[in-house]
């Protein structure tokens, strides 16, 4: 949705997409089955219930990001950047590595998406046209997030054990967080409104909260008194898992009774299993911050639900707890 306006970007998807992907004129308002050979992004005027404009592509649209100024269309191996007007005006076009999850984060001026090499993040400045590259991981990317002020970028790879924090525009690493030791699929990364915390969800059905450093600082060693492993974090020759920075607080969220929801080992180097669905699976663990102390996690699919969590401090330590939930399709 374009802010709080009447315009919505729609893409047909799933096994039987009902929003038209074939030829649509502005006066068409009927729901029809899609033409599998044509792939479109529709800009829908919800007030007049008409398609205001559309873009057509030869391959499936993995994801769309939209603001009041720009429309970003993510294909499997390409990202197109358009000025939002009728018709949309293309201003940039970039090849990417395979991107079946449609990874893309859009800020006010910065667009972050995978580069042409595995593990790379490209940051495009819509105001200047300048590009920056971060070599973030050795493995394919699984998640990307921009901070509200666009001065930090969070990344995770398909290994899912580490989350890295980068300063922008310097593109230097300022922190590295350990989600866990076992591999996992990261579902979502999201900065709090004031960028003091980073929330992370994974297919381990866990929500992690990490406290963030100032983007102008460099990495510092954590206080052993507040570290998960205490004084062991300072012992030499121990595996790095003992010295890494862990979440300040964690709690469980519900994946729901979704067939195959936890079986998300699909590599980002392969195509999605279900046409029209990024990553080939229903969205799970999508994070949204309502304010600096309240999180909502949304899951789609057959067992679609939202859960509300509150983040706070008690006895000098961070905590996160569930406040409510609802199955929103019932």
Question: What residues fall within each predicted segment?
Answer:
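Per-blade loop-tip surfaces of WD-repeat and WD-like beta-propellers in eukaryotic adaptors/scaffolds
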Residues: 42-50, 81-95, 114-141, 158-175, ...
């Amino acid at each position: 949705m374009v802010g709080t306006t009447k315009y919505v970007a729609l893409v047909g998807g799933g096994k039987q997409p009902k929003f038209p992907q074939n030829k649509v004129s502005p006066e068409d308002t009927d729901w029809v089955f899609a033409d599998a050979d044509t792939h479109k992004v529709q800009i829908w005027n919800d007030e007049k219930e008409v398609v205001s404009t559309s873009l057509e592509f030869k391959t499936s649209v993995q994801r769309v990001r939209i603001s009041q100024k720009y429309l970003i269309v993510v294909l499997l191996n390409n990202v197109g950047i358009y000025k939002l007007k009728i018709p949309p005006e293309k201003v940039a076009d970039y090849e990417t590595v395979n991107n079946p999850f449609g990874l893309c984060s859009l800020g006010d001026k910065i667009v972050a998406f995978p580069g042409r090499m595995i593990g790379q993040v490209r940051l495009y400045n819509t105001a200047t046209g300048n590009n920056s590259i971060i070599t973030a991981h050795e493995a394919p990317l699984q998640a990307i997030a921009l901070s509200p002020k666009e001065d930090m970028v969070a990344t995770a790879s398909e290994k899912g054990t580490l989350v890295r924090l980068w300063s922008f525009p310097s593109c230097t690493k300022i922190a590295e967080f350990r989600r866990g030791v076992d591999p996992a699929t990261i579902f979502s990364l999201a900065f709090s409104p004031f960028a003091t915390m980073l929330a992370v969800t994974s297919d381990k059905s866990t929500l992690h909260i990490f406290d963030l450093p100032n983007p102008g600082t460099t990495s510092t060693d954590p206080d052993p008194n507040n570290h998960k492993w205490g004084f062991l974090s300072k012992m030499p020759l121990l595996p790095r898992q003992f010295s890494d920075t862990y979440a300040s607080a964690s709690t469980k969220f519900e994946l729901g009774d979704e067939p195959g929801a936890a079986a998300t080992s699909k590599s980002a180097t392969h195509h999605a299993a279900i046409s029209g669905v990024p990553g080939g699976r229903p969205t799970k663990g999508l994070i949204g911050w309502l304010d600096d102390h309240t999180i909502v996690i949304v899951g789609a699919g057959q067992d679609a639900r939202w859960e509300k969590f509150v983040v706070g401090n008690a006895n000098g330590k961070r905590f996160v707890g569930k406040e409510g939930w609802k199955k929103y399709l019932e």
